[in-house]
Amino acid sequence: MAKKLVRFDWAMKRLLRDKANFVVLEGFLSVLLDETVKIKQILSSQSNKEEDDDKYNDVDILVENSKGELVIIEVQNTKEYDYFHRILFGTSKATVEYIKEGRPYSEVKKVISITIAYFDLGQGDDYVYHGTNTFRGIHKGDILALSDRQKELYNKQKVSDIYPEYWIIKAGIFDEDKVNDKLDEWIYFFKTGEVKEDFTAPGLPEAKEKLDKLKLTPEERKEYEAFVERLRKLASYQQTEMADVQDLIKQEKADIVIELWLDDTPIPKIAKYTKLTEEEIMQIIENHKNKSR
């Protein structure tokens, strides 16, 4: 049986900033971006307020790779309807903050934003989404390209190589019974906290070694257990909140049923208006009669 490792989001905050552990993040980035990635340095997090990060269950890390590109890796556990806007803000902030005043625009760094989401972000059937920026002609349908001189000056092959790039990994909906490639092995780890014996994706063997719960110091173990407890409380709160909302919706529908029934609306019409079955409607009416006695 695969041994349990510490959660990746906590590891990003506490363990993976250590240069000795760069190999774990380098492995993940190399698999995702399909190229060999070497981390030059870990820059300051998008937010230095650790307690706020824990409170809102948002953990991020900002990496500069050997090509001078900025990579934002963010783990998000809670649902936020404006999360797409937040991703845009993060890349924009990194773009502006990491160019020196007075320098030419050509020195703007490429930003790659990677989100590992444990909730169903947006609507879509896939669990990995990739977004790039292209300019397509509205009449001829061609893709606007860099000139040969621009390619030479900026060492870029495509316009999209200049603009921010977005990756969204919906780990929460990943089917752990269907691991088909090395990226799936990483997503399996994100979701389950386990690395199977036959997994060979770069970085995972090192993750299995360096993120072993048994190797935590007493202080690290205490911090980790507190982090996991916060996750449990947050999940419990969300579950309770959802149940309360469902109860409220159920009561509102029952009130509508009784109001229509008292107005002598036929049961089939009530069913049509409320999307309830006739059996459910009759049960609501019966409950109302019992309360009125």
What is each residue range found by the language model?
Residues V71-Q76, D181-R293:
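Short, charged alpha-helical interaction segments and adjacent helix-coil junctions
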Residues M1-R221:
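Conserved single-residue anchors adjacent to enzymatic active/cofactor-binding motifs
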